From Swiss-Prot:
The RNAP catalytic core consists of 2 alpha, 1 beta, 1 beta' and 1 omega subunit. When a sigma factor is associated with the core the holoenzyme is formed, which can initiate transcription. HAMAP family: RNApol_bact_RpoB (MF_01321). Pfam families: RNA_pol_Rpb2_1, RNA_pol_Rpb2_2, RNA_pol_Rpb2_3, RNA_pol_Rpb2_45, RNA_pol_Rpb2_6, RNA_pol_Rpb2_7. It is an enzyme of class 2 (transferase). Belongs to the RNA polymerase beta chain family. It comes from Clavibacter sepedonicus (Clavibacter michiganensis subsp. sepedonicus). The gene is rpoB. GO terms for cellular component: DNA-directed RNA polymerase complex. It catalyses: RNA(n) + a ribonucleoside 5'-triphosphate = RNA(n+1) + diphosphate. This is DNA-directed RNA polymerase subunit beta. DNA-dependent RNA polymerase catalyzes the transcription of DNA into RNA using the four ribonucleoside triphosphates as substrates. GO terms for biological process: DNA-templated transcription. It comes from the Bacteria. InterPro entries: DNA-dir_RNA_pol_bsu_ext_1_sf, DNA-dir_RNA_pol_bsu_external_1, DNA-dir_RNA_pol_su2, DNA-dir_RNAP_su2_dom, DNA-dir_RNAP_su2_hyb_sf, RNA_pol_bsu_bac, RNA_pol_bsu_CS, RNA_pol_bsu_protrusion. Keywords: DNA-directed RNA polymerase, Nucleotidyltransferase, Transcription, Transferase.
Length: 1162
């Protein structure tokens, strides 16, 4: 994936992807593999070769924190051995391994299967009584595999497992103000990965208390005595600590036995106390590895915090840990600042401090591997219960590992995780960036995380420790703001799950090339300079005092000798999507957030075009997203077609690459590969062979470079509305292809088999014209709403046949059988061209269609959507708007040389929103499009790189985030742009020019800002939103039309709209809306009848909602009656017969569109 990691790509075969960069700082580190977060975690889980190589390299470098066992090995080791209650036999598991996968990725997508491999494990059964050992290899179910792109294919759909941000296990100290007095109350919590919490607290009376498993508080000295310490030992340990001495004085318990019983009483009130049971209870809580697990990370955090040197594999608490926690707590309470401890075998002085729970040193990532591992653990513990049960019930002689093990719980747990977990999500495949960002997402929600309702502002807020780890900008707007983030560009995750970010080591004021990855806790101990701190030629700081970031996030100036580290890149604090926004430094953060989010909604266009003004991240993002085909090895292209590229490899042999043509993505956009190479071309490893959707020459290309003018135009661009030129429609500049998939099953019903056929009852031959002899539509047919895609008939209930009918049936081979037409038709509001048909038949044997399904037909319809009024466009700076008018090209304002502009934007969209990046982008875009040449040595060009002093027309430029082109450089380049044929320079350093009105040819009174801006077409397309209904489904209770396009619903006419009609006195319009157009059941059938027969419409009846109201009032014991004018009670019951009679006469049955029990039709 990350093969193409050369800083300056060499142009080959005319495929030049290099950009002219305005960067002043050279990156010491190239962008890492952006999918490593997913792939490395899964490699560890299954123990792949790549993971083994990484462990080998790490061991050579002397790293001790790496896991030496794969995730699956760990978990089977943890559960082994399973023993029966009498400990007479045991079952152990070793060496889990995966066999070859059953289906390829493409087969899984086509057939709706899961991309997985069978998991096997060696099981060993031992009978202690006879010493007999039986070993077998046992199948543990199919284990879903990750594709190269970091996704899973579950039941044919591509899914992503999002990494979770959770509180790390460890020990935490807190300070809170006591409500009544102003005293500080200190507390400590020991939080394990699994098991009971242990909490200590010093109250306002200076008593030290302990809570076991969140139950009642009790004295800490009782707890210590229960652990085996005597009063003398406690006094010895806490010499001179007043709070402990005070607590001990009030404690009347003397022996360990009494202490255990006292704790048992408080934990299990009302039960008989036995000393043995009391001891077992405490052991099970904190000292039994089956019940309590700190995990390596918890042990690591406790060691670091309390200055203890225990092995990382010690996963349970020890008395030493508990004593150290209490010592730390009482020292905090006594306002001490330092304490002695040991780290890595050396004595150290620890800084005493309370913990910040939102600090990234206390929050860790649970990546894919760990999430699946936890799920397998759940499945295995369920299986463990079954194994124990079977050990006691089966005949000892006949027991084998196979008879004991039931893999169903394990398979079910994995299936449940991938199918229903909050963290296993339907992949966002709108464009390559959407997929890449989805895989790099960090979520604080999900099982074991936070919930939206409980999360306060502090958790959601940006924290200083996020720097270089989680993007402060890219997060959703709405209820999830701050709970879902995105991993920063250079960040990586260490073996404990903490996010690390790279820094350049500074030694005695000299910046070295050594790169250290630091976690948030480690970084707190150092002073870090920013990446753009000026350096001399020998990499020393140019200034005596350097701006640094100490702990706490506030910046300060320090002497250069005191600096420890320096950022590796100016863009290391932002995520991939944010680093694609040029001039981000000139945008308000709220708008940058919208810009980062809206790039993910851009639809791949018919012809992709990479931005004139980029940031240099486009290539990295496109290649790592995996939608661009790159060469695995060097060679020469032997054969090229639209679907296959074959390469003759240098080391011998050939390699074939298959391209995807017009596939449907998860979001219904077109996924299509376009070949970039020709036969005979030389290809190096990592070079681009074919572009995917929304990429050009291996660079991300989400939108189009369009000529924009910032000016008001007849009020048509009021409130962010956008005016476009007809040229963009005519030339298909902003057209996109959308593909929908429809399927139909032929099943076995109680009355017989459904049949896919062309022979449909009461259907005219014109409607069957595009169906083949099987009754399936032909490829290439143009279809409109209501057209038949697949002909299907379903048997009706049969009556007893007479002899004549039976004879007819025998002669005509059952042709006169009673069937109804249940064909698949094009839904309302859809149309397009048939581009593919797939037929699956259960008789072929290899297609497992599910029970009762004989045949399945899948039809793909593609439609080309041109840009139209109502579509949403956006720039990369959060500047979004809806197209209000498409003007003929002759009416558009034009430049002095006659060039009409493409887009007119409202200048009022800029000052209030404070996203000035778009203006700078527009000016630089103009210079890049025209080309430039800098003459002489002007002052503004001093910091320009040498290669940027001249550029031909159409040069693609890069202006990296926080290190891009300066304002004076842009103004200077505008003055240096290439002149037109007439020797004119259309736009000067002001960035403005005189525009002429296309309608009159007169110049506009004021100069207008004109230039090239990169504009995206977003997925909010008007064709998907527009909707109309005449008749359709009604709600069961109220009998009013349903709401929303998906339900084919009506338009809500609410309370305020009723007031408006009342104000106009439009009584008849109002009456119709509230009765016959809504829920007057009898009335609406009669209206239909009257319209069909051409009669006058009758008086409306009583709406159903009025009857519901009366029923509700009667249920409140109010006797409500409706009286006629003469005082007689009126019955509100309709005669159903009347409705049915009218409906039958008209032959209307509109209920076929929605066959649902909760819906009634007219």
């Amino acid at each position: 994936m990350a093969a193409a990691r050369n800083a300056t790509p060499t142009p080959q075969n005319g495929r030049d992807a290099s950009r002219l960069s305005f960067a002043k700082i050279t990156d010491t580190l190239t962008v890492p593999d952006l999918l490593a977060l997913q792939t490395e975690s899964f490699d560890w889980l299954v123990g792949s070769d790549a993971w083994k190589r990484r462990v080998e390299e790490g061991t050579k470098q002397g790293r001790t924190d790496l896991a030496l066992n794969s995730g699956l090995e760990e978990i089977f080791e943890e559960i082994s051995p399973i023993e029966d209650l009498g400990e007479t036999m045991q079952l152990g598991f070793t060496n889990p391994y995966l066999e070859e996968q059953k289906y390829s990725i493409d087969e899984c997508k086509e057939r709706g299967k899961t991309y997985s491999a069978p998991l096997y494990v060696e099981a060993e059964f031992m009978n202690h009584l006879t010493g007999e050992i039986k070993t077998q290899t046992v199948f543990m179910g199919d284990f879903p595999l990750m594709t190269e792109k970091g996704t899973f294919i579950i039941n044919g759909t591509e899914r992503v497992v999002v990494s979770q941000l959770v509180r790390s296990p460890g020990v935490y100290f807190e300070r809170q103000q006591e409500k009544t007095s102003d005293k500080d109350i200190y507390s400590a919590r020991v939080i394990p990965s699994r098991g009971a919490w242990l909490e200590f607290e010093i109250d306002k009376r200076d008593q030290v208390g302990v809570r076991i498993d969140r139950k009642r508080k009790q004295s800490v000295t009782v707890f210590l005595k229960a652990l085996g310490l005597t009063s003398e030992q406690i006094l010895e340990e806490f010499k001179g600590v007043a709070s402990i001495e005070l607590t001990l004085e009030k404690d009347s318990i003397l022996t360990k036995e009494e202490a255990l019983k006292d704790i048992y009483r408080k934990l299990r009130p009302g039960e008989q106390v036995a000393a043995e049971a009391a001891r077992a209870l405490l052991d099970n809580f904190y000292f039994n590895p089956k019940r309590y697990d700190l995990a390596k990370v918890g042990r690591y955090k406790i060691n670091r915090k309390l200055g203890i040197d225990k092995q990382l594999t010690d996963s349970v608490l020890t008395v030493e840990d508990i004593l150290a926690t209490i010592k730390y707590l009482v020292s905090l309470h006594a306002n001490e600042t330092k304490m002695n401890g040991t780290r890595d075998g050396k004595p150290v002085e620890l800084r005493l401090d309370v913990d910040d729970i939102d600090h990234f040193g206390n929050r860790r990532i649970r990546a894919v591997g760990e999430l699946i591992q936890n799920q397998v653990r759940t499945g295995l513990s369920r299986m463990e219960r079954v194994v124990r049960e079977r050990m006691t019930t089966q005949d000892i002689e006949a027991i084998t590992p196979q008879t004991l093990i039931n893999v169903r719980p394990v398979v079910a747990a994995i299936k449940e995780f991938f199918g229903t977990s909050q963290l296993s999500q339907f992949m966002d495949q709108n464009n390559p960036l959407a997929g890449l960002t989805h895989k790099r997402r960090l979520s604080a929600l999900g099982p074991g995380g936070l919930s939206r309702e409980r999360a306060g502002v502090e958790v959601r807020d940006v924290h200083p420790s996020h720097y270089g780890r989680m993007c402060p900008i890219e997060t959703p707007e709405g209820p999830n703001i701050g709970l879902i983030g995105s991993l920063a560009s250079f960040a990586r995750i260490n073996s404990f799950g903490f996010i690390e970010t790279p820094y350049r080591r500074v030694v005695d004021g000299v910046v070295t090339d050594q790169i250290d990855y630091l976690t948030a806790s480690e970084e707190d101990e150092f002073l870090v300079a920013q990446a753009n701190a000026p350096l001399t030629k020998d990499f020393r700081f140019a200034e005596d005092r350097v701006l640094v970031r100490p702990k706490g996030g506030e910046v300060e100036l320090v002497a250069k000798e005191n600096v420890h580290y320096m950022d590796v890149s100016p863009r290391q604090m932002v995520s991939v999507a944010t680093s694609l926004i040029p001039f981000l430094e000139h945008d308000d953060a709220n708008r940058a957030l919208m810009g980062a989010n809206m790039q993910r909604q851009a639809v791949p266009l018919l012809r992709s075009e990479s931005p004139l003004v980029g940031t240099g991240m486009e290539g990295y993002a496109a290649i790592d997203a995996g939608d661009v085909l790159t060469a695995d090895a060097s060679g020469v292209v032997a054969e090229v077609s639209a679907e296959v590229v074959t390469i003759q490899l240098d080391e011998g042999g050939t390699q074939t690459y298959y391209l995807r043509k017009f596939d449907r993505s998860n979001q219904g956009t077109s996924y299509n590969h376009r070949v970039l190479v020709s036969a005979g071309d030389r290809i190096e490893a990592g070079e681009v062979i074919a572009d995917g959707p929304a990429t050009e020459n291996g660079e991300l290309a989400l939108g189009k470079n369009l000529l924009v003018a910032f000016m008001p135009w007849e009020g048509h661009n009021f409130e962010d509305a956008i005016i476009l030129s007809q040229n963009l429609v005519k030339d298909d500049t902003l057209s996109s292809i959308h593909i929908e998939e429809y399927e139909v099953d032929a099943r076995d019903t109680k009355l017989g088999k459904e049949e896919i056929t062309r022979d449909l009852p009461n259907v005219s031959p014109e409607l069957l014209a595009d169906l083949d002899e099987r009754g399936i539509i032909r490829i290439g047919a143009e279809v409109r709403p209501g057209d038949i895609l697949v002909g299907k008939v379903t048997p009706k209930g049969e009556t007893e046949l007479s002899a004549e009918e039976r004879l007819l049936r025998a002669i005509f081979n059952e042709k006169s059988r009673e069937v109804r037409d249940t064909s698949l038709k094009v839904p309302h509001g859809e149309q397009g061209t048939i581009i593919g048909v797939k037929v699956f038949d259960s008789q072929d044997g290899d297609d497992e269609l599910g029970s009762g399904v004989n045949q399945r037909v899948v039809v793909f319809i593609a439609q080309k959507r041109k840009i139209t009024e109502g579509d949403k466009l956006a720039g990369r700076h959060g500047n979004k708007g809806v197209i209000s008018k498409i003007l003929p090209v002759e009416d558009m304002p034009f430049l002095a040389d006659g060039t009409p502009v493409d887009v007119i934007l409202n200048p009022l969209g800029i000052p209030g929103r404070m996203n000035f990046g778009q203006v700078l982008e527009t000016h630089l875009g103009w210079s890049a499009k025209q080309g430039w040449e800098v003459e002489g040595k002007p002052k503004w060009a001093e910091r320009l790189p040498d290669h940027a002093r001249q550029a031909p027309a159409g040069t693609k430029v890069a202006t990296p985030v926080f290190d891009g082109a300066l304002e004076e450089e842009i103004a200077g380049l505008l003055d240096s742009t290439t002149v037109t044929r007439d020797g004119d320079r259309l736009i000067g350093s002001s960035g403005k020019t005189r525009l002429f009105d296309g309608r009159s040819g007169e110049p506009f009174p004021e100069p207008v800002s004109v230039g090239y801006m990169y504009i995206l077409k977003l997925h909010h397309l008007v064709d998907d939103k527009i909707h109309a209904r005449s008749t359709g489904p009604y709600s069961m209770i109220t009998q009013q039309p349903l709401g929303g396009k998906a339900q084919f619903g009506g338009q809500r006419f609410g309370e305020m709209e009723v007031w408006a009609l009342e104000a106009y006195g439009a009584a008849y319009a109002l009456q119709e809306l509230l009765t016959i157009k809504s829920d007057d059941i009898l009335g609406r059938v009669k209206v239909y009848e009257a319209i069909v027969k051409g009669e006058n419409i009758q008086e409306p009846g009583i709406p159903e909602s009025f009857k519901v109201l009366i029923k509700e009032m009667q249920s409140l014991c109010l006797n409500v009656e409706v009286l006629s004018a003469d005082g007689q009670a009126v019955s509100l019951r309709d005669t159903d017969d009347e409705v049915f009679r009218a409906a039958e006469e008209l032959g209307i049955n509109i209920s076929t569109r929605f066959e649902s029990s909760s819906i009634d039709d007219i």
